[in-house]
Curated annotation (Swiss-Prot):
Species of origin: Burkholderia lata (strain ATCC 17760 / DSM 23089 / LMG 22485 / NCIMB 9086 / R18194 / 383)
Binding, FMN: 10, 16-18
Bound cofactor: record note: Binds 1 FMN per subunit.
Cofactor(s) required, per the database record: FMN
This protein's record includes keyword ATP-binding: no
Residue ranges that the Swiss-Prot or TrEMBL entry lists as coiled coil: none
Name of this protein: FMN-dependent NADH:quinone oxidoreductase 1
Role according to the record: Quinone reductase that provides resistance to thiol-specific stress caused by electrophilic quinones. Also exhibits azoreductase activity. Catalyzes the reductive cleavage of the azo bond in aromatic azo compounds to the corresponding amines.
Family: Belongs to the azoreductase type 1 family.
InterPro entries the UniProt entry points to: Flavodoxin_fold, Flavoprotein-like_sf, FMN-dep_NADH:Q_OxRdtase_AzoR1, NADH:quinone_OxRdtase_FMN_depd
A Pfam match: Flavodoxin_2
HAMAP family: Azoreductase_type1 (MF_01216)
Plastid listed as a keyword: no
Length: 206
C-alpha cells in the first residue's frame, strides 16, 4: 500500500499551478497501487499558526510539566510529524513568494523540523530520522529561475531540498512550472513542459 502525503501551500489555493500539478501527481502515483491512499495537508485553506514561545518552550519540557497552551502547541507538531512519518511518498506543492516558499509552507517546516525527533546530533554531525521516503517537489514561479540571470535568486528549490535532506529525506525529484507571469504563450509552454516532466516521473515510479 502506497501512503502518499500531499502538501499544498500556495496562497492562490485551487487557482495555483503548483497546487494543480501536485494534486495531479499525487493522484497518478496513488493510481499505481489499488490500495494507494492520499492524505491531504492543505496549508492554504487550513493554515498552521506560526511557532511561538509556547511551542519552543513546551517541546523542551516533559509532557507533565507543560501548560495547556504548551501542550496544545506540541501536540499539533507531533501530529504533523506522525503524519509525515507514516507516509511512503511525499508530494509538496510550493509557489514562489518573494523568491522563496510561502509562509504557509515555512510554518509547516518549522513544526516538523524538531531536534531529537526528526533529526539528531551525533559524533558525525546531524542525522535525519525520516529516511527512505520518496519526495516530489512541484515548484512554481512567475519568472524563470532554473537557469539564466535569475537563477542565483531561487531561494525556493534549493532551500526546500536542504530542509528535507536535513531530516533525512534525500530522495527528491522536482517538477518546475516556470514563467507564469510572462504572457499567455509562456504559461502554456510552462504547463506543457511541467506536464511532460510529471508524466516522466510517474513512469519512472513504475
Amino acid at each position: 500500500m502506497s501512503r502518499i502525503l500531499l502538501i499544498t501551500s500556495s496562497p492562490r489555493s485551487t487557482d495555483s499551478l503548483s497546487t494543480r500539478f501536485a494534486h495531479d501527481l499525487a493522484r497518478q502515483l496513488a493510481a499505481r497501487d489499488a490500495a494507494g491512499a492520499v492524505t491531504l495537508r492543505d496549508l492554504s485553506n487550513d493554515p498552521l499558526p506560526h511557532i511561538d514561545d509556547a511551542y519552543i518552550v513546551g517541546r523542551m519540557l516533559p509532557s507533565d510539566a507543560r501548560s495547556a497552551e504548551q501542550a496544545q502547541a506540541v501536540e499539533l507538531a507531533q501530529a504533523l510529524v506522525d503524519e509525515l512519518r507514516a507516509a511512503d511518498i511525499v508530494v509538496i506543492g510550493s509557489a514562489m513568494t518573494n523568491f522563496g516558499p510561502s509562509t504557509q509552507l515555512r510554518a509547516w517546516f518549522d513544526r516538523v523540523i524538531w531536534p531529537q525527533v526528526t533529526f539528531r546530533y551525533g559524533e558525525s554531525g546531524v542525522a535525519g530520522t525520516l529516511e527512505g521516503k520518496q519526495v516530489y517537489l512541484v515548484t512554481a514561479s512567475g519568472g524563470i529561475f532554473s537557469e539564466g540571470p535569475y537563477a542565483p535568486f531561487d531561494y525556493q528549490s534549493g532551500y526546500l531540498k536542504h530542509l528535507l535532506g536535513f531530516i533525512g529525506m534525500t530522495d527528491i525529484r522536482e517538477v518546475r512550472v516556470e514563467g507564469t507571469v510572462l504572457g499567455a504563450e509562456a504559461v502554456q509552454a510552462a504547463i506543457a513542459k511541467a506536464g511532460q516532466e510529471l508524466q516522466a516521473l510517474v513512469e519512472q515510479a513504475g
